[in-house]
Amino acid sequence: MNAKRLTKLGGVFLALTLSGGVAAEESRMPVVRIAELEIDPAQMDAYKAAVKEEMSASVRVEPGVLAIYAVAEKGSPTRLRFFEMYADEAAYDSHRESTHFKKYVAITKDMIKSRKLIETVPVQLSDKRK
């Protein structure tokens, strides 16, 4: 890379930094949340039905919901882990205000024995896009 081009790139980076352009790019990063839940064993089947309905609706009708995955710990089927990815913070906020999410919360509130929500900062996100 020649010195003239390097100088131009440096100027562009400096301008973006001073104008807040870099911060704006960071705010458009996907939002990734992880949730760890323990479900009452006696209510596990009902919980699975409720979460399946909620997750299906979320990915079907919310454009900002990029992915939601639920898995159980091997050997501990009532200990669930959720990996959720949203286009941005606004998409996450919209999801939490959706009718199907509020219904899920109301239906499952007494089924969940414990809940831990983990906010993350994406380091590297890779997938196979079609």
Feature-to-residue mapping (PLM):
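An amphipathic, aromatic/His-enriched active-site/gating alpha helix that lines ligand/cofactor pockets
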Residues: 26-27, 53-67, 85-119
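N-terminal targeting signals for Sec/Tat export/insertion, comprising classic cleavable signal peptides
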Residues: 31-61
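Acidic/polar helix N-cap motif
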Residues: 40-43, 76, 88
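Glycine-rich beta-strand-turn "strand-cap" elements at beta-sheet edges
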Residues: 4-10, 21-32, 69-78, 105-130
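Repetitive helical segments and hydrophobic/amphipathic motifs
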Residues: 14-17
